[in-house]
A protein has these predicted regions:
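Non-catalytic, usually N-terminal nucleic-acid engagement modules in DNA/RNA processing proteins
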Residues: 1-173, 200, 204
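A short alpha-helix capping/helix-coil boundary motif
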Residues: 17-19, 101-104, 184, 209-211, ...
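Residue-level recognition of conserved structural "scaffold" positions that shape functional pockets
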Residues: 25, 95, 111, 183-190, ...
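Short, Lys/Arg-enriched charge-dense amphipathic segments
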Residues: 74-81, 85, 110, 160-168, ...
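Intrinsic disorder/low-complexity segments
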Residues: 171-210
């Protein structure tokens, strides 16, 4: 934290691929590229961090291929920080083609109709293989308005999923992953058309970027009591930073501002805060 004035905060977010000045706006590179913009264009525009989409990269080209190509940074040609979402929002947006259970989200791919199951653990594993600098937990994002009991059940489920995400994340980080059986990192593995390409079939590291951080997400719809409950349970798990999710999904802008206003003070003052899915600067 560099400076505070009222509720405004000015800070720096340190990642394995550089420092981001906050507050920051993230251009969206859904499938690993920001449309109609090169990496140089983005730098010239002042972008310091890019968001990529786990759902789309998982379905095509797949996290294994991205990892084998050296991770998302090499795949995108972007040397700066990258944040990946969990893929949950896209899965939930499929409507009738998905079903939510305690295990996770079961859905059919919009590409080929194949059935997929996105669990909290799988969301962590995919993002670890992609090698982003910031990975998000899998949460349930309800469209608003929604019945109170449905919001309550969703909030509690998201808290349970957050614990499962954190447990898997810490397991991967503690496993010494980041190098393959030969001792090389994903970035050091030869590409298919390079000398030594036969060794491209050696087992891939589970973690492409050992410096990856994980953000927890506070849910709770537009209900202050449920926002407080979600914040309490998410903070009890312990993450590198915290996000406010479940907004800009159909509620009036005034309601969004109110929810942010009473949720932000519940988050630690010494940790970064991420307002998810809000694409119009206030």
């Amino acid at each position: 934290m560099l400076h505070e004035e009222g509720a405004a905060r000015r800070g720096e977010l340190a990642t394995a691929h550089g420092v981001v000045q906050t507050p920051a706006f993230m251009p969206v590179g859904t499938r690993g590229a920001v449309k109609a913009a090169t990496a140089r264009d983005l730098r010239d525009c002042g972008a310091e961090i890019i968001l990529a989409n786990t759902y789309h990269l998982w379905l095509r080209p797949g996290e294994d291929l991205v990892s084998r190509l050296g991770g998302l940074h090499r795949f995108m040609g972007w040397e700066g920080p990258i944040l990946t979402d969990s893929g949950g929002f896209q899965a939930f947006s499929l409507g009738a083609r998905r079903a939510v259970t305690e295990d996770g989200v079961r859905f059919r791919s919009h590409l080929d109709g194949s059935e997929r199951l996105l669990t909290p653990e799988r969301a962590v594993e995919i993002q670890a293989a992609l090698g982003s600098d910031i990975a998000m937990v899998l949460d349930e994002c309800l469209a608003q308005p929604a019945p109170l009991e449905q919001v309550r059940e969703s909030t509690e489920r998201s808290a349970r999923w957050a614990r499962r995400c954190r447990d898997r994340f810490l397991q991967l980080q503690a496993s010494g992953a980041g190098t393959s059986r030969s001792g090389r990192t994903a970035a050091e593995l030869p590409l298919a058309d390079s000398p030594g390409a036969a060794s491209v079939f050696e087992p891939l590291p589970l973690v492409t970027n050992p410096g990856q951080a994980q953000f927890g997400i506070v849910q709770g719809g537009t209900v202050p009591a449920l926002r407080a409950l979600s914040a309490e349970r998410t903070l009890a798990i312990g993450f590198e930073a915290y996000a406010i999710g479940g907004l800009s999904v159909g509620e009036p802008a005034e309601t969004m501002y109110e929810v942010v206003g009473h949720t932000a003070p519940l988050l630690p003052a010494n940790r970064p805060r991420y307002l998810m899915g809000v694409g119009t600067p206030a």
